[in-house]
């Protein structure tokens, strides 16, 4: 029986990829956490751009880390 010891890559959760990443994710997949929170807020609010401004900015900031200008 061989004991397989895998590197602890599972400990890195929700950590953005380095800016100079060789494999840049597609815009739709770059920031799923901030995108989901922003979209949920926009759908549930009557005045999305105002009520969700902080979530929108958080998503823009996340996207900028990957080199996307939103």
Curated annotation (Swiss-Prot):
Pfam family, one: COX17
InterPro entries the record matches: Cys_alpha_HP_mot_SF, Cyt_c_oxidase_Cu-chaperone
Motif Cx9C motif 2 per UniProt: ranges: 52-62
Keyword field contains Methyltransferase: no
Any single biological process term in GO: mitochondrial cytochrome c oxidase assembly
Skewed-composition ranges (Polar residues): 1-12
SUPFAM superfamilies: Cysteine alpha-hairpin motif
Disulfide bonds, paired cysteine numbers: 31-62, 41-52
Localization per Swiss-Prot or TrEMBL: Mitochondrion intermembrane space
Record motif Cx9C motif 1, residues: 31-41
Residues annotated as domain CHCH: 28-70
Keywords: Chaperone, Copper, Disulfide bond, Metal-binding, Mitochondrion
GO cellular component, one term: cytosol
Binding annotation for Cu cation: 28-29
GO molecular function: copper chaperone activity; copper ion binding
Major location category of this protein: mitochondrion
Function: Copper chaperone for cytochrome c oxidase (COX). Binds two copper ions and deliver them to the Cu(A) site of COX.
Annotated PANTHER family: CYTOCHROME C OXIDASE COPPER CHAPERONE
Family that this chain belongs to: Belongs to the COX17 family.
Protein name (record): Cytochrome c oxidase copper chaperone
Source species of the chain: Schizosaccharomyces pombe (strain 972 / ATCC 24843)
Phylogenetic classification of the source organism: Eukaryota, Fungi, Dikarya, Ascomycota, Taphrinomycotina
Gene: cox17
């Amino acid at each position: 029986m061989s004991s397989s010891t895998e590197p602890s890559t599972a400990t890195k959760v929700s950590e953005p990829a380095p800016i100079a990443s060789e494999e840049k994710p597609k815009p739709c997949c770059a920031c799923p956490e901030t995108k989901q929170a922003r979209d949920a807020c926009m759908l549930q609010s009557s005045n999305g751009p105002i009520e969700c401004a902080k979530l929108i900015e958080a998503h823009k900031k996340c996207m900028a880390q990957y080199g996307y200008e939103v």
